């Protein structure tokens, strides 16, 4: 488990917007940024209560936060999200595009609706979040996009749709890093492996050799931890800490990179 040492408020005065921050990895990212003093915009689409609970949890750290509902698959909603964030806090310094969905489906069964649903959220939405971040961030800002270990992973069946949706984000990252350079904005992506969230609970068995639906979670954790030199699977805090580093001024020379977050796992 990630340690819980007290962290310095190294992001005091910064404002961060995190999409899909009401739960899972997004929540973990938001809390780590808040612990370092950043003010947070907690974006959510449907789960208002969990998002407000994150706002309340952030308040206990001494940082400020607001929850803003927006369906980021719709560009007008993305525009409104940024405008409301700016109206609330006055400026933006950090944008983390976290929202996503995962799918495992035999390729011959993938429908046009499946394709649109996955690419609209995992790919198209991330492009327009990054576009709006580029426009609205102050000079020296930070953009962090969400890829996945799956983007460059072979041997996982029925995963082409998801893997492709994340691979495109890695291309966005390298190109946006060039385009945003004149504003001294860095653009990076993170590519986590399995992280203990509700999405992990539903899908992690696919990554376990000989995994089956309904496998006990203890077996799944043990199976995946066996591939990791650190002997465990990730928790959202692990991902949040890396994003907190990328958000910090000290990370300025890290730009246009896709950072694999697997604890050294080899699968």
UniProtKB/Swiss-Prot annotation:
EC number from the UniProt entry: 1.1.-.-
Entry binding sites for NADP(+): 25, 45, 71, 98, 162, 166, 195, 197
Record-linked Gene3D superfamilies: NAD(P)-binding Rossmann-like Domain
SUPFAM superfamilies xrefs: NAD(P)-binding Rossmann-fold domains
Transmembrane segments: none
Key words of the record: NADP, Oxidoreductase
Disulfide feature: none
Family: Belongs to the short-chain dehydrogenases/reductases (SDR) family.
Protein role: Hydroxynaphthalene reductase-like protein; part of the Pks2 gene cluster that mediates the formation of infectious structures (appressoria), enabling these fungi to kill insects faster. The product of the Pks2 gene cluster is different from the one of Pks1 and has still not been identified.
Name of the molecule in the record: Hydroxynaphthalene reductase-like protein Arp2
Species of provenance: Metarhizium anisopliae (strain ARSEF 549)
